């Protein structure tokens, strides 16, 4: 079995690759530069990678060409507003790109028995900022949304890593890459206040899910 690409959950990878992929068309929604899709391409019949960021899709095309992948297709599209049915997917993946709209579109595109596997932000992601992402799910909400859309949840787990810091300076340095985004939405202020009040952690928390269309 091929190993998970760098930065991709091994649990998620195992859930996807435990399926017989050889004759399947895989749709990777919110693909970015194709990290997950291109790693799956050698295992599948065809991979379609969709993202609304045209620059990311251009980079995905370059990476596919450099890797010599001939069974892949790149599409610029908004995965929250476009339908997936025309792609004819047999399996759908989403890595840190998740919303109720994506679940609903995946359900409409997959025939019974086919799999939707994803990694989503968990509501504990960066909990120290005092503001969960609007794209974050807890376990109960994920099950509820999937069941309502017509999926049976086969696997659901939370992967969590809590970084611990010796000082405020160390904690701020670890989050510096997020500073601009957090300053724009108020999360930076809350994180700094958390540190000033004695907090010394930063939590990464992801939800790993495999669901099958009923």
Describe each PLM feature range.
Residues 3-24:
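Conserved alpha-helix/loop element of class I SAM-dependent methyltransferases that forms part
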Residues 24-30, 115-141:
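Conserved class I S-adenosyl-L-methionine
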Residues 35-81:
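Class I SAM-dependent methyltransferase SAM/SAH-binding core
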Residues 80-91:
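A short acidic, Gly/Pro-enriched loop at the edge of an enzyme's catalytic core
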Residues 90-103:
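A short SAM/SAH-binding and catalytic strip from SAM-dependent methyltransferases
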Residues 102-115:
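A short glycine-rich, Lys/Arg-flanked "PGG" loop and its adjoining helix->strand segment in the class I
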Residues 157-214:
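Conserved Class I S-adenosyl-L-methionine
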